[in-house]
């Protein structure tokens, strides 16, 4: 379930859809790090991902055509507890940056084609 804050036609009962984008990226990063670490023989004792997205609400609220409706940028840090060397972790990061599907979706243009269909009520 997602929601919007009070004042944005929401009840503040769940994360905003944009926060779910960050959660999807964080989850995909963690999973991809674990997969490629195992492939490279790197043992990960613990991993966590912290992300922040910067969004100017003027875009979302259609107050400025020059401001994007979504994130202007996403920054974050992946914290890894491991006996691996710094150079091995840097190589791991390069592989993850290349093969993380959600990161790939966010970094390159993706064709998205959405339609709307009217549902007819049974009483109509």
For the regions a protein language model found, what residue spans apply to each?
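Extended beta-strand/beta-hairpin segments
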Residues: 1-23, 35-124
